[in-house]
Amino acid sequence: AAAAPLPNHAAPRGKAGLEGFDGLAEALGGTVLGQPDYLQKLVIALKRPYVMGHEGESARNAFLVTGPADTGKHLSLCAAAEELARRGVFVSGDISWMDLSLYPTAAEEKLFLQDLYMALAAKGDIVVFEHYERCQPAFLTVLSNLVQRGKSPLAGRYVLQNGRLVDAGNALVTDAVGALTPRGKYLVLLSEAPVAKLADSFGAPFVSALGDICETAALTPESLSAVAKAEFDKLAARAQKALGFTVTAGDAALLLAAESSGRAKGAQGVLAFWDRAYRALAQYRLEHDDAPKAAALGAADGRLTADFGAGPADLLSLLPEAYQGEVEAVKAELD
């Protein structure tokens, strides 16, 4: 029997339209700190099909998100999807993620196609492809076809079975699937590599076919300070609720947190800093029957201190020895 594209329609749209994007960049800026220019470009990429028009099962838009590590690429996409779902533009805040490094050789072809179909068939509006640099080149051709042609023919004979794409082999079938389509989803390539690397892997016509290129910037000291304060506020709220005492942080503690990113200038070091701090505060609570009234965080000799009422002391010394070893290893990397 003649093969046909996937027997489905484009993913349903939310009821809201272009007006649902009003003030979106500013709203995202409350979650993704220090990236105002990037957020403007991201909003434009998401808004583009609502201005330019889009119909059918081709990609609603295809774009690249790139930039240094730990600068908000994943966070911004998640925050945008959730906010657009809340506003009624998207039907779901979910995102489908595909790690292309899981398919390094031709032997993973069936797995790749099955996973790709599941990602395209999921209820979210966005499909993100990561680590294209480590993917089998033949599979990148499939993605290139989805972006440039709106569909990608399947070389083998496949059928849908219980919602999954299955190789039909030599079996006699009447409903073979002949091609994959983007189903009206946003297709996003996410990478730390520059645009030139994308052209090397996919070719210049593919890059030209992308609707937008959104690039994050390395976080400035001011941005890292803002991240440090925002993450501390989360820690303080969590400690008040779970540990039963108030936590404050002086300027020295906040500066130490902001500088914990090291040379990478990403937010991950700051997040890890406050994660260790919370673990140490929790350890103090575990070791004492009565909760202190408050804990005041400070810094001395490059170490985070806490004053529970008897004077400042090294907070991270409360961590179990194995965990302290991990802390020292992280510090050595940052130095």
What is the role of each PLM region?
Residues 54-95:
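Walker A/P-loop
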Residues 10-17, 31-32, 83-93, 121, ...:
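Conserved C-terminal "switch" segment of AAA+ ATPases
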Residues 92-124:
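Short glycine-rich substrate-engagement loop in P-loop NTPases that contacts/grips substrate
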Residues 3-11, 52-55, 69-78, 267-335:
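C-terminal engagement/docking regions of AAA+ P-loop ATPases
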Residues 76-77, 109, 120-164, 197-209, ...:
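Conserved AAA+/SF3 P-loop NTPase catalytic/coupling segment centered on the Walker-B
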